[in-house]
Amino acid sequence: MSIRKATLDDANAIKQLLKQLDYPPGNFVRKKMSVVMNNPNAFLLVHEEAGTVNGFLQLDFVPQVALRGDFARISYFAVDQQARSKGIGLALEQYVVKLAKKRKCDRIEVHCHERRKAAHRFYYRQGYKEVPKYLVKPVG
């Protein structure tokens, strides 16, 4: 069991994990992965066991002009449906906490769709709190 930076060879596994989260399939995933992997303010991580990717997480660091520390945002986080409740999500979350502390972030944020009740319970157990209000303006 290991956590490592994703490579482009992980694209198909990540596409399958995104599909489990109800994201539509897209031919752009590999290209977007390359963009993320070349961004110094982002990490694309995978959890691998016996040569199989069974979880992934995208972490983005956001610089803050008004505060000393940056903040970290979990943009995507998925564990294979067949591998849930085995500590994989916890291992990935603990790994990003270490990255955020190393970067001197003052918080980690995560946006999680309201229909993902099991994910909410996971985040609450890890110490996350609901902090309203999150406003979104579609632009495309």
Predicted region positions:
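Conserved acetyl-CoA-binding loop of GNAT-fold acetyltransferases
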Residues: 124-133
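Conserved N-terminal entry element of GNAT/NAT acetyltransferase domains
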Residues: 1-9
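Acetyl-CoA-dependent GNAT
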Residues: 8-69, 75, 93
